[in-house]
Design a protein with these regions (language model features):
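Conserved signature/switch motifs of ABC ATPase nucleotide-binding domains
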Residues: 138-141, 159, 191
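Conserved ABC ATPase signature
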Residues: 139-143, 147-149
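Short coil-to-helix segment of the ABC ATPase nucleotide-binding domain corresponding to the Q-loop/switch region
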Residues: 98-106
Length: 229
């Protein structure tokens, strides 16, 4: 295990309602690394992501993210862990009753930001980063699916996370829009943020090659692009 690893999971066991989903799973992710997480529906991809952001406990084994001990993390530490993680879901989960800017402002204030000028500055920065600097006044329903997912990505970037966990981020998008989202995530990764992305879209994996880890039989297996995905 590298001392510089951002994420290190060693032989972890994770359960959901007493069912063992991950059984002896191990994974190491370095700073700035892009990793695809593949596997069948129900194989444990989402369970793995939930264990990293402390939504599901690690029953056995060892887990570390940065300075956090994921197995023994205390409830009061979880908000601080999640500030270092950006989380992206396929179903957007934007607040439908407020504008893009108000969605982003809500997250910043909920994570301790108070200075109005700094809040406005950070919102402008992330909207520019995802190419939607002119859409801040829009309501979520006025945006396309691709634009909504870009807003979700901008929300994940607000606190300058060390890693982004993306759970099927292109699942509800058409192929062209999905490719645009992958391109954006790759750019974010190239800028130094680690990306751990679960996907069923092997066309994306082949077109935008990166490290591949397969979830199967409760364990994690390194895959090569030339292997049968």
């Amino acid at each position: 295990m590298s001392e510089q690893a951002l994420l290190s999971l060693q032989n972890i066991i994770v359960k959901r309602e007493e069912n063992i989903i991950l059984n002896g799973a191990s994974l190491v992710v370095q700073p700035g690394e892009f990793v695809y997480l593949i596997g069948r529906v129900g194989s444990g991809k989402s369970t793995l992501l939930k264990s990293i952001y402390a939504d599901l406990p690690i029953s056995e084994g060892e887990g570390r993210f940065g300075d956090f001990d994921l197995k023994h993390i205390k409830r009061k530490q979880i908000p601080f862990l999640r500030r270092e993680l950006g989380i992206i879901f396929q179903d957007f989960q934007l607040l439908t009753d407020r504008s893009v800017v108000k969605n982003l402002e809500f997250v910043l204030r909920a994570t301790g930001w108070k200075d109005k000028k700094l809040i406005q500055k950070r919102i402008s920065e992330v909207l520019e980063q995802v190419g939607l600097e002119s859409k801040g006044y829009k309501m979520p329903h006025e945006l396309s699916g691709g634009e909504q997912q870009r807003i979700v990505i901008s929300r994940a970037l607000l606190n300058k996370p060390k890693m982004i966990l993306a759970d099927e981020p292109t699942g509800n998008l058409d192929p062209i829009t999905g490719e645009q989202i992958i391109t954006l995530l790759r750019e974010i990764g190239d800028a130094g943020t680690s990306i751990l992305m679960s996907t069923h879209n092997y066309a994306h994996v082949k077109k935008f090659p990166a490290r591949i880890v397969k979830v199967e039989g409760g364990k994690l297996q390194e895959m090569q692009l030339k292997q049968d995905l």
